[in-house]
């Protein structure tokens, strides 16, 4: 497995990222992760292919229990219209993710990859030292092609929201 150094850090401490980078124009790897639908006590499985034909935004975060990740997740609620499926992805337990989304009255789904590092490796966002995901944003069109990919190096910084919104509004996604 590819390991990348010098591409992620927090407060000057370098982190190793596992997996190769994905780029616009590439097919997005399918995934299977858990979500906890509101009002249900048992997690269910979600895959990227479940929403084929729709534009998807993957908001990949370290943990929903950190201020930067919370701010970022709230921001996507404000910026992205209902015609785009937003998934917040982390290695948090599905119960923690759903609790936070419920408190915030968020409309989008949270996906948990806590059982496996497969998503992190496939999307090139697994932080080896933390066993968490690197902050990143992916916009995937209805055909499953990546139209925007941003890997945020400084884990204390938010992504470039406008670049992702521009990719969504470019009209070439449907």
Task: Report each predicted region and the residues it spans.
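Chalcogenol-based redox active-site neighborhoods
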Residues: 1-174
């Amino acid at each position: 497995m590819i390991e990348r150094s010098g591409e992620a850090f927090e407060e000057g401490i370098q982190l190793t990222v596992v997996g190769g980078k994905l780029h616009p124009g590439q097919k997005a790897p399918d995934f299977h992760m858990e979500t906890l639908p509101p009002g249900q006590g048992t997690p269910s499985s979600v895959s990227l292919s479940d929403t084929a034909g729709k534009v998807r935004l993957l908001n990949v975060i370290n943990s929903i229990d950190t201020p930067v990740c919370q701010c970022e997740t709230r921001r996507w609620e404000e910026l992205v219209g209902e015609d785009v499926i937003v998934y917040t992805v982390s290695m948090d337990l599905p119960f923690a993710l759903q609790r936070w989304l419920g408190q915030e009255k968020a409309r989008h789904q949270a996906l948990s990859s806590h059982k496996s590092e497969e998503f992190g490796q496939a999307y090139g966002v697994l932080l080896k030292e933390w066993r968490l995901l690197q902050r990143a944003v992916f916009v995937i069109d209805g055909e499953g092609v990546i139209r925007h990919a941003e890997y945020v190096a400084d884990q204390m910084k938010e992504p470039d929201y406008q670049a992702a919104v521009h990719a969504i509004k470019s009209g070439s996604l449907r």
